Amino acid sequence: MKQSQMLIPTLREVPSDAEIASHKLLLRAGMARQLASGIYTYLPLALRSLHKIQAIVREEMNNAGGQELLMPAMQPAELWHQTGRWDVYGPELVRLRDRHDRPFALGPTHEEVITSLVRDEINSYKKLPINLYQIQTKFRDEVRPRFGLIRCREFIMKDAYSFDTSQDGLDRNFQAMYDAYTNIFTRVGLNFRAVEADAGAIGGKGTYEFMALCDIGEDTIAYSEEGDFAANLEKAEVVYKPSAKPATEAPAREKLHTPGIKTIDQLVQALQIEAKQIIKSLIYRVDDKLVMVLVRGDHEINEVKLKNLYDATIVGLASEADIVSVTGAPAGFVGPVGIDPEKVDIIADNFVQDVYDGVVGANETDYHLTHVVAGRDFTVSKYADLRNITEGDECPRTGGVIKFARGVEVGHVFKLGTKYSTAMGATYLDENGRSQPMIMGCYGIGVSRTIAAVIEQNNDENGIIWPVSVAPFHVHVIPVNVKVEEQRQASEQITEALRKAGIEVLFDDRPERAGVKFKDADLIGLPLRITVSDKAAQEGTVEVRIRKNGETHDVKLDQLVDEVKGILSRVDQTGAALFGN
């Protein structure tokens, strides 16, 4: 492909609204342009890479037994009402009405649509199991689109849905998808980890997120180097081992005047104590119930664990009016002592049991209580794992030490069970003629997000460094001076020879200075650059440069095709077949 004929509008300056490397480079390398906040046009180079990612996804999905279809993006609200998600999903769901005033949504996901389809078309165990997938544009009205293709309002996603007659069948499909995802993200060149996760708004039990590791990731991953444990912060279990009780009982509690001191940091400074001696008390509204949650002052409440403990739909901090009605005091001076259990549940994180001489709010403005002990001074209805894991905690699997990393979610696999099939009446007749709900799994990949994650992990100060498997082209052929006939002819011959060998070539035939073309080549980041100078005619050699490490090789023209194939195979780390015959 001649570069002069392609739309590749490279930029020298970094766009002011681009925050991260992948966003900057997608814009500077002429691969994407923003139409509106969180909405992008994919230009020819980016689209070539997207198509390659999609081809890898299709190959692995088909190998795992998936069947591709394509569902509508526009979904009737009626389906979402059947599952109850129309009211639960929130403002991220793009809602609209047609000319007949009928409500619809632009799909962020397709559980309702696929369940409706399978419900209407499959009614016997003989037609199960089945795994159906699509690659399609999705919509989500993000409150704050950011980081380019990492968090968009319109994005490309692969979503798959399996339907089984048994839990064992679901487990097999789930493992097949897990293995397929591992192959996909390995082949596209990502450094990733599969981490235990919470199912969130999708619902279901048993889920893993596939995280591309990078510093700009919005998610924190807890992992241990001693084994294969990895989980996101929402899911990571905290190991609790009771500490030894002190030999002496804490003194009787005292009321202390603490004017204007509301935060943990302020209490630590004012009382000259450690944060772990404070019992932090927060009041939540869990669905229609008020709950006081206690956690040690140096820990943070995990709202996902709280939601799961109550099997709740909605969890959020209580209003100031609710807090005052329960405690008589504003937030910052709230505590468990003297609280009426008829008005509010009192639950606590496991580690609150280790606070034997603690500080809590006195339920009175500008006052706290000291020398407080759980069990003696207040009663907890239930202890549970309710806090975020922290670095240095014990790994729940291996006993090793927990460390943190940042990651971008590029894939997610769920065991949905019968959540959607029961709600929507997706049943089949078993061997005995009895009606049973189908058992479902759900499996998503952010295709457009993956391209951003690949760039985020593969770049330097000069531009993108594409992995061979998803590069827009394999080789960039650049004549130093395209006006020199010998250089042009040699470049055209090289391009054609490589093309016939199944190697994809971008031929920079523009009448630009060599320095400009080299800068653009580094910015675009194709795996190999072949520089054609006068030496091509005089000595029969060209320079081959590896983008990944900057190595250069002088290669004879009659050996060039084989040498390029060999270098590309060595540079590629996925072990995939790269070229045709």
Curated annotation (Swiss-Prot):
Catalytic activity: tRNA(Pro) + L-proline + ATP = L-prolyl-tRNA(Pro) + AMP + diphosphate
GO biological process: prolyl-tRNA aminoacylation
Gene Ontology cellular-component annotations: cytosol
Keyword terms of this UniProt record: Aminoacyl-tRNA synthetase, ATP-binding, Cytoplasm, Ligase, Nucleotide-binding, Protein biosynthesis
Highest taxon listed in the record's lineage: Bacteria
Localization per record: Cytoplasm
InterPro entries reported for this sequence: aa-tRNA-synt_IIb, aa-tRNA-synth_II, aa-tRNA-synth_II/BPL/LPL, Anticodon-bd, Anticodon-bd_dom_sf, Pro-tRNA-ligase_IIa, Pro-tRNA-synth_IIa_bac-type, Pro-tRNA-Synthase_IIa_type1
Domain notes: Consists of three domains: the N-terminal catalytic domain, the editing domain and the C-terminal anticodon-binding domain.
Entry-linked PANTHER family: MITOCHONDRIAL RIBOSOME PROTEIN L39/PROLYL-TRNA LIGASE FAMILY MEMBER (PTHR42753), PROLINE--TRNA LIGASE (PTHR42753:SF2)
Family per similarity comment: Belongs to the class-II aminoacyl-tRNA synthetase family. ProS type 1 subfamily.
Entry protein name: Proline--tRNA ligase
